[in-house]
Amino acid sequence: VLIENWRRGSLEKLGLGYEALTKLNPGIVYCSITGFGPGEDEKRPGYDFLVQARGGIMGITGFPDGEPTKVGVAAADMVCGLQAAMATLAALYRRAETGKGTRIEVPLFESQLSWLANRAQEYLVSGEDVGRLGNAHPSIVPYQTFDASDKKIALAVGNDTQFENLCRAIGRPKLAEDERFAKNPDRVANREVLVAILQEEFSKKPADEWAEEIRDAGVPIGPVNTLADVFSDGHVLSSGILRDVDHPAAGKIKLLASPVLVDGERLPIRHPPPTLGQHTNEVENGEWL
């Protein structure tokens, strides 16, 4: 398997393109992560921030009265990497079945378009773009953050039954009987009125109190955490996803393990992050080639 992210055509100039290497190894799985796929910009480089902007994610992220905002991590890079990994695994399965290699290309820009998901399809079907909604959902209400008396909480009411349970939990059962709010389409149409009512209620108690009461009613709710909050969260600490690893330069460090569990066991961290140049000799001497 060869995975590369050079600009389109660069490795061909060095004699390391797919056509050259497949002659040496017909079973090679050759995966190129490019900036843009076939088209007028196919030779342009791509970066996460650029494709978040040009690909529409920034245009739908942020508050209506604020600036378009990038995602807090390099999400375009990461999703593209996941898609490249899935395509490579599929190619390995094909090779095991047929003995044939595969030429794969995963463009960063088109990969980002693919995770516009429901927002892309809504626009393609209706021709309408609802733009930036902050922490609200375009087609589900209430599904957003609210200000409790001490900090923000995130409420995700996914269906009408959960809305009824929410109304009982906050002491406003008649809201679920109000024709303006009884069904989700009604709540979407009357979003501003309902959100104002709920915000008034949520401001009366701290977030933790609301979370306990509303969770007990079977409604998804949780705090809006800082990183310090996240890594002191009881579930995070009990889940086994945080691991202590001995690093040759930094000593004992904490790392996040894989989220995947296999047969009930979380996958181990086999090696610490490499130091600069740690594997240069293995690569140059051909041990990895």
Please report, for each region that a protein language model flagged, where it lies by residue.
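Residue-level detector of anion-binding/catalytic polar loops
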Residues: L2, G27, P220
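Active-site-adjacent "lid/gating" segments in soluble enzymes
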Residues: L14-I153, V157-G158
